[in-house]
Every structure is written in structure tokens, then in C-alpha cells.
């Protein structure tokens, strides 16, 4: 086992990364190795898809499936051996299908096949023992014994960034947004990474290409969400329980939430969101359901306590899932899509009757607590509508700085930095927030500036796209670059979606970003120095020191 893709990975003085029987996320060495094999086969699929594209062969089924399968290897998604093996076997079949199509095309065109890299000729063994024996040869850090560690680090930066983009591609696909040019670019990058490149400059350029590609993917996802559910509206959400039977929906998939709301109409079941599903309450086509009653709980790392205390059925639509056996709720949590845990019921298709039956059989909340309302819903359209008023307050001198404070949350104590930072932001400043990092402070009262809330909840992690649109609008109004705005980004990272958003910001030329709580372990000191020099990325220190530096610039 070797895994170093998330923020909680082991970091010893002489060795970084999870490399023992179980990773910090809870996945076993076997699952980790199987995921490495799956990634390698997917790189082979992409090699043949990339080659097929040169002959105008486009296989929509494979294009739509490949990023989805890659998403299954993202942190806290799929822990189920049989499901990962099934994905690997299907990848092998798809690779063969593409290969046969390419061979037929080259024969027809009387052209020879190019010299094939190892990744293109890799064949999945027939037995689990043989697959696991082979796993170290295709590990994500393969060649580390002889290859410069900076090369390995940049390969991983690209691989993990592309994995985050693949997750957003799958979210967009679910909402009907596909783009063959994006799929072609994805396959080209994935294929190239499978050839184990060693050129540092080429790898840095690749990371920027991934960032720009992801910007387009986030635009697709924004379009899918707003076309399907309407533009988010500033909305009040109750974060306290209401008496009655209940279902909790976590993850990111608004499509699943809509299906659950439709199927629970008239059944006297209250539906709650959790984690990154909080923004659902601001979409007109979702908030119209009266039994979507509120948000329960906080960020993913608290679920083993919060889910244990939730007296109803739970649906996990995407990341982040952690061991449900710890809180003894494995018998009432259901996984969806590429999410899986051994022994946990998995919902195929759009029939949630199992979930509904489970909720009806459970006690539900016995009492209604005093409501506590928070404000959300400042997506792209709402931000653009508010922009004239914001600009006017800036010109009057009432708003002097903008902070984007958010990102992925996690369990480390150092993450209290983000709570303290938000609390210490000056009263003449606005705070934009997004992703589950917002739970560090989103229940606090930040007041307003002449009617403009000081805390603006932009949405899910992918709604960084909305924040970028506001920054571009402000830069246009004040005839300056984004980096010349009184705008500071303070981002917490945990997994691969955060990595690709960071790459997107870098690729768009955004500099001076503060990140934490720690630097990605897969980046060497040399690479961190290069990134700091090129993009002025800064590690967080203390809220007081960082605010002093920011506001005195």
C-alpha cells in the first residue's frame, strides 16, 4: 500500500504517506492496491480513447464512464473490493473494445499502430491474488526508487488534480452536461500520465492545463445545476431538528435529493441535508418541497457521531463516506453511484423505496428543537445581482476588503485557524465561503454592511466558479486584475477536488492564496518553493499574523 492523496495522510520524518495495513481514511491496503490497479487500467483506457479520437472514433459510453470510475478512487468514496474489481474488469473490457476499433481503423487506413507504451498493453490478471501481486508495479509512485522525487510529486499533483476534475465531470454528467472536447482532453492527459513522464516543465504545464479544463467543467456543472433546479436564491435554512420521521441526504448529488423529495411526498417524512448538500435549500426547484425541512449536522469528519445520533435513514450520494460501523448505523445508511462500503445497502437506479421503508420503520425525531436559521444561496446569479450594491459600498468606503474563506474541512486541530480567522476579519470586510469548510463558522452571526450580509455562502466546492465570476466582475468594474483587487483567498484543503480548484485558480492567474492547514505531503519542499515563487502561494500561520500581512499590503 502507498497512498498520499489526502491531507490526513501519515507524515513521519523519514516517510510520508499511508503504507501500512490501513490508511488514515479507513481503506485497507488491499483496497488501496486495487484502486492503484484501477487507475492504471483507466490510463490504458484513456490511451486507446485518445488514439481512437485521432481516427474520429468517439465512444460516448466509455467517455461518460471513465471519469466516473476514476472518481471511485477519490478519498472517502469506495471501500468495497467487489465493486472496485467490477470497475477494473469493465475497464479491461472497454480497453479491448477501443483497441479493436483502433486496429480496424488503422488497417482500413493502411497505417501501422504507433509504438505502444506499457500502460496500453497492460492486461488485468484473472485472479485477485495475481492482481494484488502486480499492484506495486503500477502504484501511483512507481519508479520512486530511481526517479527524482520532484517528478513523482508533480505526477501526483497532475493525477490528483485530474481526479478532482473527473469527479466534477461526473457530477455534471448526472445533470445532463457532457462535452466531447472535454472528454478528449481528459483522455489525452490521463493517457500521458500513464506513460510516466519525467519532464518537470511539461508536468507543470500539464497541471495548468488540468486547471483550465476544470474551469470549463465547473461551468458545465453550474449550467447543469441552474438549468435543472433554477438559480440559487438567498434563503434561510433551519439547522435544528423537527419532530417526525426523517431521511438525511449527504454528499453532492442534487439529482438524488430531488428524486428522494419526489418519492417522499405525502409520506410524512422530513428530509434533511448534510454537509455539501446544504446549498440545496437555495435552489427554487428543490426548496419548493415543504418536507425539505432543514440541514442536520456539519462537515464530513463529524459524521460518525452525527449520523449515529440521527434517528432515520441516511443516503450517501458521493464523497465523503467514513466507516459507518463505528457509530453502529451501517444498517440504515445507503450508498449511491460510485460510493460503497462492504455490507452497506447500495441503491441502483432511482428507486429509493428501501430508504423510505427504513425511515418509516425508525423512530425519527421525538421533539422539535428551537429553530436556528442561517443564510445561504449566494450563487453566481445572486452574487451578480448583488454586485452593483457591493460596488457602491466599496466606492463609499464602507467595504474595504473581500475574503474567500472555505474549502474542504477535516479533523486536525489546526483547522480552528479558519474559525478564528473568520471571527477576526475586520467589520468593513465581506467574507465569501463555500464547501464544507464553512461549517467552521457558518452558524455565527457576522452582521451586515448596510444591508449586505458580511457572510455570503456561495455553495458547494465547485461553486468556486461563482466566486470567480464575482471577482471578474469586480475587476472589470474597477479596471484592474483580480490580483489588484482587495481580495484574499484563504483555503482549506483535504482531498482531490480541492487540489483541482487550486490548480484552476493558479491557471487563471490568481496569486497570493493562503492554504492550510498543512501543505500536501506529495509536494516536496522544492516543489512548494517553485509554487510559492510562481504563484505566491502562502502557508497559513496564525490568524493575527496573516491578517496583519494581508491588511498592511
UniProtKB/Swiss-Prot annotation:
Under catalytic activity, the entry for this protein gives: A + NH4(+) + H2O = hydroxylamine + AH2 + H(+)
One GO term in the molecular function aspect is:
metal ion binding
Residues annotated as carrying Cysteine persulfide in the record are 408
Q: Which GO terms describe its biological process?
A: response to hydrogen peroxide
| EC number in record | 1.7.99.1
| Enzyme type, top EC level | oxidoreductase
| CDD domains linked | HCP (cd01914)
Annotated positions binding [2Fe-2S] cluster: 3, 6, 18, 25
Cell compartment(s), UniProt: Cytoplasm
Q: Which terms are listed as keywords in the entry? A: 2Fe-2S, Cytoplasm, Iron, Iron-sulfur, Metal-binding, Oxidoreductase
Note on how the cofactor is bound: Binds 1 [2Fe-2S] cluster.
**PANTHER family reported in the protein's UniProt record:** HYDROXYLAMINE REDUCTASE (PTHR30109:SF0)
UniProt record similarity statement: Belongs to the HCP family.
The protein here is known as Hydroxylamine reductase
Q: What is the lineage of its organism?
A: Bacteria, Pseudomonadati, Pseudomonadota, Gammaproteobacteria, Vibrionales
Amino acid at each position: 500500500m502507498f497512498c498520499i492523496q489526502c491531507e490526513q495522510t501519515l507524515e513521519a520524518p523519514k516517510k510520508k504517506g499511508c503504507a501500512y495495513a490501513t490508511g488514515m481514511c479507513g481503506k485497507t491496503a488491499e483496497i488501496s492496491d486495487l484502486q492503484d490497479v484501477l487507475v492504471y487500467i483507466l490510463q490504458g483506457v484513456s490511451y486507446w480513447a485518445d488514439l481512437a479520437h485521432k481516427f474520429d472514433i468517439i465512444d460516448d459510453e466509455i467517455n461518460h464512464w471513465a471519469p466516473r470510475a476514476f472518481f471511485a478512487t477519490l478519498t472517502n468514496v469506495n471501500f468495497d473490493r467487489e465493486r472496485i474489481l467490477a470497475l477494473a474488469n469493465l475497464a479491461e473490457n472497454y480497453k479491448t473494445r477501443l483497441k479493436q476499433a483502433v486496429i480496424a481503423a488503422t488497417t482500413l487506413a493502411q497505417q501501422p499502430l504507433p509504438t505502444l507504451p506499457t500502460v496500453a498493453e497492460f492486461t488485468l490478471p484473472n485472479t485477485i491474488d495475481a492482481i494484488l501481486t502486480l499492484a506495486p508495479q503500477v502504484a501511483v509512485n512507481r519508479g520512486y526508487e530511481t526517479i527524482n522525487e520532484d517528478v513523482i510529486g508533480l505526477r501526483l499533483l497532475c493525477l490528483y488534480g485530474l481526479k478532482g476534475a473527473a469527479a466534477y465531470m461526473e457530477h455534471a454528467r448526472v445533470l445532463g452536461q457532457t462535452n466531447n472536447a472535454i472528454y478528449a482532453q481528459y483522455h489525452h492527459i490521463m493517457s500521458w500520465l500513464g506513460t510516466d513522464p519525467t519532464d518537470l516543465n511539461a508536468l507543470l504545464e500539464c497541471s495548468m492545463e488540468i486547471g483550465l479544463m476544470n474551469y470549463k467543467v465547473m461551468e458545465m456543472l453550474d449550467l447543469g445545476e441552474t438549468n435543472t433546479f433554477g438559480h440559487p436564491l438567498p434563503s434561510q435554512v433551519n439547522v435544528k431538528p423537527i419532530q417526525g420521521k426523517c431521511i438525511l441526504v449527504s454528499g453532492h448529488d442534487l439529482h438524488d435529493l430531488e428524486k428522494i423529495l419526489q418519492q417522499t411526498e405525502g409520506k410524512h417524512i422530513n428530509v434533511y441535508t448534510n454537509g455539501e448538500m446544504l446549498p440545496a435549500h437555495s435552489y427554487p426547484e428543490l426548496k419548493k418541497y415543504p418536507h425539505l425541512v432543514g440541514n442536520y449536522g456539519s462537515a464530513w469528519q463529524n459524521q460518525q457521531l452525527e449520523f449515529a445520533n440521527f434517528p432515520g435513514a441516511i443516503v450517501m450520494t458521493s464523497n465523503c463516506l467514513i466507516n459507518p460501523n463505528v457509530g453502529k448505523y451501517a444498517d440504515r445508511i445507503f450508498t449511491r453511484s460510485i460510493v460503497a462500503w462492504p455490507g452497506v445497502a447500495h441503491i441502483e437506479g432511482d428507486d429509493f423505496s428501501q430508504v423510505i421503508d427504513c425511515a418509516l420503520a425508525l423512530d425519527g425525531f421525538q421533539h422539535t428543537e428551537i429553530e436556528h436559521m442561517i443564510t445561504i444561496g449566494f450563487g453566481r446569479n445572486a452574487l451578480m445581482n448583488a454586485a452593483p450594491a457591493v460596488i457602491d459600498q466599496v466606492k463609499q468606503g464602507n467595504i474595504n476588503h473581500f475574503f474567500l474563506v472555505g474549502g474542504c474541512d477535516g479533523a486536525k486541530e489546526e483547522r480552528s485557524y479558519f474559525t478564528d480567522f473568520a471571527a477576526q476579519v475586520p467589520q468593513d470586510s465581506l467574507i465569501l465561503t463555500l464547501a464544507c469548510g464553512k461549517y467552521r463558522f457558518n452558524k455565527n452571526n457576522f452582521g451586515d454592511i448596510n444591508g449586505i450580509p458580511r457572510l455570503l455562502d456561495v455553495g458547494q466546492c465547485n461553486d468556486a466558479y461563482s466566486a470567480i465570476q464575482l471577482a471578474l466582475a469586480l475587476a472589470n468594474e474597477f479596471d484592474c486584475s483580480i490580483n489588484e483587487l482587495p481580495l484574499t483567498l484563504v483555503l482549506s484543503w483535504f482531498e482531490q477536488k480541492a487540489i483541482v480548484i487550486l490548480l484552476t485558480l493558479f491557471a487563471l492567474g490568481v496569486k497570493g492564496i493562503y492554504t492550510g492547514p498543512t501543505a500536501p505531503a506529495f509536494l516536496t519542499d522544492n516543489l512548494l518553493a517553485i509554487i510559492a515563487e510562481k504563484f505566491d502561494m502562502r502557508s497559513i500561520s496564525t490568524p493575527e499574523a496573516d491578517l496583519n500581512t494581508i491588511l498592511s499590503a
